[in-house]
Amino acid sequence: MTTMNPRSSLNAAVPFAKRTDAVDFAGSDPLLGKLRLVGDWSIEWVGGHRGPFRLEISAPQIIEVRDERAERLPDFRTSRDGWLKGLQLAGVKAEECTISGAFLHESLIVKSTPGVGERIYVRGEDYDFDPDWGTLWRLEGGAISGEQEVWIDSSYVPQRIDSLVWDASGSVLLKEGQPHISMPGVPELREGETRLANIHLPGPISRLGEDNLFPVLESAFPEEPRQGRPFADELLPRTLAKLRSGEPLRILAWGDSVTGYKRYQVSFKEWLQARFPSAQIELLTVAWGGKTSVDYLAEPPGSEYHFEEKVLGAKPDLIISEFVNDASLEEKETEILKRHARLLASFREIGTEWIILTPHYVKPDWMGLARQRDIDEDPRLYVRVLREFSAINRIALADASRRYGRLWRQGIPFLTLMENGINHPNRDGHQIFAESLISLFAGSSSI
């Protein structure tokens, strides 16, 4: 039987030198305060009419997993993705992936029976593992057969978000969040409380750093006032006309696995229906997990994902395209522009209007980012080209990337909205897409 037990916290398990310096953290909140690091696990809030307030953060908790049963260990799977190389340890599993960096590989014990184990297998002889992703596999010629069950002991460190809160009495207090391997939530507030900052513990860290501090600088994404006609009136006139008149309107959401969840487009449709009560909206989805728009365009006739048959052939009035996977392609700017010019010509030929949905932020190192705050500007070439292409060609752009880039200002580490810890947004993450789409219709009358 698998058991998971909290053990010691990391500050007891990982040695480090005592910290004596104090690091200023630039940033203000609704109460015009300032957050400072004053120790390895100590923060100080200075602001308001009382204080300063010094608070101690509990170090991340180690979770021990004992006697996890595996019916068999697979052979090594050749893959550039660490979460696919072997058996995924239960503690670090998130959706179809595992969470990188959460697994404490020094803790791993693979044995023939539960408990102390009749036989303890040897890494490098009987099995091996990916220390970052928490996957393991048997080695040919070792003592573990291909059909043999094994029992596994391991430890991992989940994420946690604590909140610095100003309460009704004018005091600052710390609320500790609930640990979760991929999506730690923020602590709930009581009436009269204001969240000043969040402290994100992303896994096994030995001390707090500036990148763990997320002051609440904004309560929501700052919508820029539109100069001139509303976006939908200017860029989506036929769609808007059908929404107002009650003529049938067919919307096609086209994309990859993110679109395949059928979340953001459903929320968008529900909003449109409420905004335009007489509208007759039909929503279709064409989604291909793990693929790109390049893959769609390369599919032959008769394929389940043939572009001309499945996308153009649906004869939509409006297409919403979402391709986070396109952002990972190693392409030149000219290649991106050429493909989107082809798409635009195809859509205009059949009289279809188009909304380009920019992708969300994904695992930071996949984007060339080193942290989850101070990241307003998306560094990906693909996103920059989409913005420029849509502006030049007068295409509606729902800029979800821009909203994701400012989540840190709301005290939210964006990766905590990913169900798989990489690139699959949860419902809150999909709502950001929906809000990006809805913003295009801000100011458009319903009649």
What do these predicted ranges mean?
Residues 143-158:
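Extended Gly/Ser/Thr-rich low-complexity repeat segments
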Residues 229-253:
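Membrane/wall-proximal cationic-aromatic binding patches
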Residues 128, 284-286, 398:
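General small-molecule cofactor/ligand-binding pocket signal
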